[in-house]
Amino acid sequence: GRVLAPGFIDVHTHDDTVVIRHPQMLPKLSQGVTTVIVGNCGISASPVSLRGDPPDPMNLLGQREAFAYPRFSDYRRAVENAHPAVNVAALIGHTALRSNHMDDLHRTATAGEIAAMRVQLKDSLDAGALGLSTGLAYASAFNAETDEVLQLSEELTAYGAVYTTHLRSEFEPVLEAMDEAFLIGRHARIPVIISHLKCAGAGNWGRSPQLLAALESAAKTHPVACDCYPYAASSSTLDLKQVTDAFRITITWSTPHPGMGGRDLQDIAGEWGVSLMDAARRLQPAGAVYYGMDEADVRRILAHPLSMVGSDGLPEDPFPRPRLWGAFPRVLGHFSRDVGLFPLHTAVHKMTGLSAARFGLSERGEI
């Protein structure tokens, strides 16, 4: 027989600029995705007024010329004029706001800088933004104190807007990072969504029951959820804090050494006769795939009732992870049909109705 399903919602994308420059959106339409949520992990295309090259990890969205939207209303107008083949809903990135008002991203913001960020955030919410995202694990936001985010989150309350976060750590201190996210949600009385929940790093494998127990505990008194992608590898910029010989790391791009794209960091270091860390420093700025998760943890998180499906695909990456094109078919074909992790209707719910409800998307996710 045949199955009728709503268009899928990709809740975790970095399609901010590609929906304008490549509105056909073939990587998403080919999977059945009809709505994308952009602005995740603290990085968004707007509101941004760059004074130079985009800081890491905003460079995942494109080069300086891609950031042409000083106000969210400018970005919204550009998306509408591009007529992308998918619906677009947008978060405002904390790191994007910081880049507009701070001369040094490796510190916490001053009271005046926070006030300026709040004005921009409110203006964006007035223009239709869904909420605020943070990427506190990245160097460009890691030194932001919790109070900085608490103050920004207060702007979300009146709108019932959502707070999503790439946690301050997905490694050993992940539970403390989750507690920080829940604190922010309680403070502003807003829903919290933890981005790509995972147990990162070999020393962290097997801890998914602890993470999910913390999520369930928080959900008893507050609206919280998470998204995840159906793969045991992550992809982002090359982060020196994640350089290790405990698992494989593949370089996807490098500005000073473009020919190294597609090669393993271990091989590059061996060819150069240097340590992994020295090789990583030479390659930066660069992108990488980290094979740093355990399949059992991925399955456990994916199957949990509070988890949604998000691809976290990187359309600007010259060697993108398969999740850009294949996340949703992998959930349906591999995890639901072949593995039997959950029935088809549960798989569909995780990429439609649940997603629409958590992000407050009306007239989406249901038939």
Regions found by a protein language model. Give the residues of each.
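Divalent metal-coordination and catalytic microenvironments
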Residues: 1, 12, 32, 88, ...
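Polyanionic/metal-chelating signatures
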Residues: 47-68, 73-76, 95-112, 185-192, ...
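Active-site mouth loops of central-metabolism enzymes
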Residues: 10-19, 101-115, 138-144
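Structured alpha-helical segments in the cores of large, soluble enzyme domains
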Residues: 116-129, 145-158, 174-187
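C-terminal helical cap
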Residues: 264-299, 329-367
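Acidic-and-aromatic substrate-binding clefts and catalytic sites of carbohydrate-active enzymes
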Residues: 18-20, 141-144, 169-175, 201-206
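Divalent metal-dependent hydrolysis catalytic cores, especially in the metallo-beta-lactamase
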Residues: 27-65, 85-100, 125-140, 157-169, ...
